[in-house]
Amino acid sequence: MKASDVRAFTADQLKDELAKLKKEQFNLRFQKATGQLEKSSRINEVRKDIARVKTIARQKAAEVKA
């Protein structure tokens, strides 16, 4: 997911996307623990996507306050 794609989201969409990514991260961690994970790089991708969404959400919140 690119940052430019995330910037187009509304605040509600950002919250939904964050919840979806956290759920996916949980499932990936569970798969890793049980030895069923095929693409271990996906864990890092999801982690970075979560950081991207959180960062842009903070930036949008700061713009509203300013």
From Swiss-Prot:
Q: Does the keyword Membrane apply?
A: no
PROSITE patterns (UniProt xref):
RIBOSOMAL_L29
Instruction: Tell me which family the UniProt entry assigns to this protein.
Output: Belongs to the universal ribosomal protein uL29 family.
Would you tell me the Gene Ontology cellular component terms? cytosolic large ribosomal subunit
Q: What superkingdom heads the lineage?
A: Bacteria
Which CDD domains does the UniProt record give?
Ribosomal_L29_HIP (cd00427)
Per the UniProt record, the source organism is Rhizobium johnstonii (strain DSM 114642 / LMG 32736 / 3841)
Extract the Pfam families matched here: Ribosomal_L29
The name under which this protein is listed is Large ribosomal subunit protein uL29
UniProt keywords, alphabetically: Ribonucleoprotein, Ribosomal protein
GO MF, any single term: structural constituent of ribosome
Which GO BP annotation is one of this protein's? translation
Ranges annotated as spanning the membrane = none
Instruction: Please name the InterPro entries in this protein's record.
Output: Ribosomal_protein_uL29 (IPR050063), Ribosomal_uL29 (IPR001854), Ribosomal_uL29_CS (IPR018254), Ribosomal_uL29_sf (IPR036049)
